[in-house]
Regions:
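Fungal secretory targeting signals
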Residues: 1-18
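A short, N-terminal "cap"/entry segment at the start of jelly-roll beta-barrel domains
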Residues: 16-130, 230-313, 317, 323, ...
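Ligand-binding loop in jelly-roll beta-barrel domains
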Residues: 16-21, 177-178, 183-213, 331, ...
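Conserved SET/PR-domain catalytic core that frames the SAM/AdoMet-binding pocket
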Residues: 132-133, 137-140, 185-187, 312-313, ...
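Short acidic-glycine-tyrosine-enriched beta hairpin
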Residues: 136, 152, 166-187, 333, ...
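Glycine- and acidic-residue-biased ligand/ion/polar-headgroup-sensing regions
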Residues: 138-141, 146-168, 318-321, 326-349, ...
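Short coil/turn segments at secondary-structure boundaries
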Residues: 146-149, 165-168, 196-197, 204, ...
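Active-site-adjacent segment of 2-oxoglutarate/Fe(II) JmjC oxygenases
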Residues: 199-257, 381-436
């Protein structure tokens, strides 16, 4: 009788108990080799775990419950999402997805640059804000254009020149670098160009989650869509002058290399400079020092033109956390620049869900939902932008609320049957100093 290799393997597999077979294919790590991701680990307090930083492989075991994984896996994604693989025991109920990575967004590649977007189409909860990540090499131009939505931007790397025109006919030119912002109100025409030595990369933010980068009003698109006789009449030139205009939109393209602003500023008889300032140096702001990091807030208070977008730039130190809080006036749209974090969103009715974020991720937290941002790493900082479709930045601190509410009221709510616990808690909040990023406990 002849046996195939496969039949021999199958008979061997059937001879082994299923639990043993599973462990052979997916070995159960001991506590020393895989941290808390094993059936023996007990953690009643749901401590954070930096699986990526500590090279651990998350598995769905929690306090003795759970099992191995037998099906297809993406281990890299699992390591980036330890609190999805093993959620805190306090998670309960259902929430829409609140996380998207720009790494999962389609990239449009053009001459000397590229662009990708995160909108309500990619992330269904991103209803108030859309984001675009764009790269322009040295001399590369994002062509003259405008759009229905206001545009706010943060320079991630490199140097960029912006131009704009206001409704009074005033022109504006500025050169920006990492950490700088610009804001163009709805309908205001503008352009962008990468500067020496390596161009630029930036995050664009629009005050409408349904924005589409493919549907902006482009100069070349309009000109090619207009009869040449009309162009001639509008510019008082012969129609033949427009024979060589582009036959299709340019969008992103290699331009001639820019000179200095002084050399390039228009100098016609009726040219005038805008009275508006479309740019702002966010990272040059004096930061608010906290016990766990640095906070910079930019809204219409210190960047007056930015009427529809407010933002905070946070440096969350190793082991620190953005305190428990909520925002009453807008959804939070977060962009993670550096580090690894976990965020638990409290949605009322006993519903809470924890998400993990790494560099390049977008997070959404609907207005009024309580949350925090905890740095998973004890060695590296988290750098994140909190962005809001709002004129001013607003938040409520749970710590301040507890400290500025009558002690009896607080104790009756939380520690009615625990006088000792009440005493410790009330002492901790008796001086409710503002501390939006809290240092790790010593």
């Amino acid at each position: 009788m002849k046996f195939s290799v496969w039949s021999l393997l199958a008979s061997t597999a059937l001879a082994v108990p299923l639990s043993d077979w599973t462990q052979q294919q997916h070995p159960i790590a001991d506590p020393e080799s895989n941290g808390p991701y094993n059936p023996k680990n007990k953690d009643p307090y749901d401590h954070k775990v930096d699986s990526y930083g500590k090279n651990l492989q998350p598995l769905p075991w929690r306090n003795g419950e759970g099992a191995t994984m037998m099906g297809p896996r993406n281990k890299d994604r699992e390591r980036q999402n330890p609190d999805m693989m093993r959620p805190p025991s306090t998670d309960h109920g259902s929430l829409p997805n609140m996380r998207w990575s720009f790494a999962d967004s389609h990239i449009r590649i053009e001459e000397g640059g590229w662009t990708r977007q995160t909108t309500v189409r990619e992330l269904g909860s991103s209803v108030e804000i859309a984001g675009v990540n764009m790269r322009l090499d040295y001399g590369v131009i994002r062509e003259l254009h405008w759009h229905k939505q206001a545009e706010w931007a943060y320079v991630l790397e490199g140097n960029v020149r912006v131009t704009a025109l206001d409704t009074e006919g005033g022109q504006f030119i500025d050169d920006l670098q990492k950490g700088d912002l610009w804001y163009f109100p709805s309908g205001h025409p503008h352009s962008l160009q990468g500067l020496s030595p390596n161009g630029t990369e930036f995050l664009l933010v629009f005050d409408d989650g349904s924005f589409d980068e493919e549907s902006t009003f482009l100069l070349t698109d309009w000109l090619k869509s207009t009869p040449k006789s009309v162009l001639a009449e509008n510019f008082k030139l012969a129609p033949e002058v427009f024979e060589t205009i582009p036959k299709k939109e340019k969008y992103i393209f290699q331009g001639t290399l820019p000179g200095s602003i002084k050399d390039e500023e228009p100098k016609g008889a009726n040219v005038k400079k805008s009275k508006l300032n479309f740019t702002h140096k966010m990272l040059d702001q004096e930061p608010r020092n906290t016990t766990g990091g640095l906070v910079r807030i930019t809204d219409s208070t210190n960047f007056p033109i930015s009427k529809t977008i407010a933002a905070a730039h946070l440096d969350i130190g190793p082991g620190a956390m953005r305190e428990m809080h909520w925002h009453p006036n807008a959804d939070e749209w977060s962009f993670f620049i550096k580090g690894r974090a976990r965020v638990t969103i409290f949605a009322a009715d006993g519903t809470a869900r924890t998400f993990n974020y790494v560099a390049g991720d977008v997070g959404v937290i609907p207005r009024n939902m309580g949350h925090f941002i905890e740095n998973l790493s004890d060695d590296e900082p988290v750098e994140v932008l909190e962005i809001f479709k709002a004129e001013k930045f607003q938040d409520f601190s749970l710590f301040q609320w507890m400290g500025e509410t009558p002690k009896r009221m607080v104790a009756d709510h939380i520690f009615a049957d625990d006088p000792e616990g009440a005493e410790k808690f009330l002492k901790a909040v008796q001086n409710p100093v503002e501390d939006p990023i809290r240092a790790a406990p010593e």
